[in-house]
UniProtKB/Swiss-Prot annotation:
Its main location: cytoplasm. Residues 36-150 form the sHSP domain. Induction: By heat shock. It comes from the Eukaryota. Residues 1-42 are annotated as: Important for thermostability under elevated temperature. Disulfide bonds: none annotated. It comes from Oryza sativa subsp. japonica (Rice). Coiled coil: none annotated. This is 16.9 kDa class I heat shock protein 1. GO terms for molecular function: unfolded protein binding. GO terms for cellular component: cytoplasm. Keywords: Cytoplasm, Stress response. InterPro entries: A-crystallin/Hsp20_dom (IPR002068), HSP20-like_chaperone (IPR008978), Small_HSP (IPR031107). GO terms for biological process: protein complex oligomerization; protein folding; response to heat; response to hydrogen peroxide; response to salt stress. The lineage of its organism: Eukaryota, Viridiplantae, Streptophyta, Embryophyta, Tracheophyta.
Length: 150
C-alpha cells in the first residue's frame, strides 16, 4: 500500500458544487482570471527512483514538445518548465465553463549526488513528459585476499 497521496478526492473543498451565485459573479469577473491558470502553473510531477535511475513524469495534455524545456542548472538542479497557450477567443463566443488551464509553469528538483546529469533524457508522448536521470553505479569495495604465512 502506498502512503503517497495521489489526488484531492477526499478534500471536500475541492469538489465541484453547484453555486447559485456563480453566474452572477461570472458576469462581473471575466472567465480568464488568474485562477484559470493556477492548476497548470503548479504542474504536478511524479518522481520515482528505480535501481538504475530517477524518473520524473508530468501530465501535459495539449502541450507541444516545443513548448517544454528540460534543463540542468547549478550542476544538480533539474528544471522542467513550459507554457500552454490560451485558445484564441472570438468576441462572439460565450463561454459557459472554463476548466482547462493555460499559462506557464516551472518546477525545480535538486538531484542527489548519484545522478548522472550529463546523461539526462526526456521524451513527450501522448501528453506525458518523462525525464530519466541515470544513477551512477555504486562501486563495490575492492577486496584483496591476503595470504597468511607461517
Amino acid at each position: 500500500m502506498s502512503l503517497v497521496r495521489r489526488s484531492n478526492v477526499f478534500d471536500p473543498f475541492s469538489l465541484d458544487l453547484w453555486d447559485p451565485f456563480d453566474s452572477v459573479f461570472r458576469s462581473v469577473v471575466p472567465a480568464t482570471s488568474d485562477n484559470d491558470t493556477a492548476a497548470f502553473a503548479n504542474a504536478r510531477i511524479d518522481w520515482k527512483e528505480t535501481p538504475e535511475s530517477h524518473v520524473f513524469k508530468a501530465d501535459l495534455p495539449g502541450v507541444k514538445k516545443e513548448e517544454v524545456k528540460v534543463e540542468v542548472e547549478e550542476g544538480n538542479v533539474l528544471v522542467i518548465s513550459g507554457q500552454r497557450s490560451k485558445e484564441k477567443e472570438d468576441k462572439n463566443d460565450k463561454w459557459h465553463r472554463v476548466e482547462r488551464s493555460s499559462g506557464q509553469f516551472m518546477r525545480r528538483f535538486r538531484l542527489p549526488e548519484n545522478a548522472k546529469v550529463d546523461q539526462v533524457k526526456a521524451g513527450l508522448e501522448n501528453g506525458v513528459l518523462t525525464v530519466t536521470v541515470p544513477k551512477a553505479e555504486v562501486k563495490k569495495p575492492e577486496v584483496k585476499a591476503i595470504e597468511i604465512s607461517g
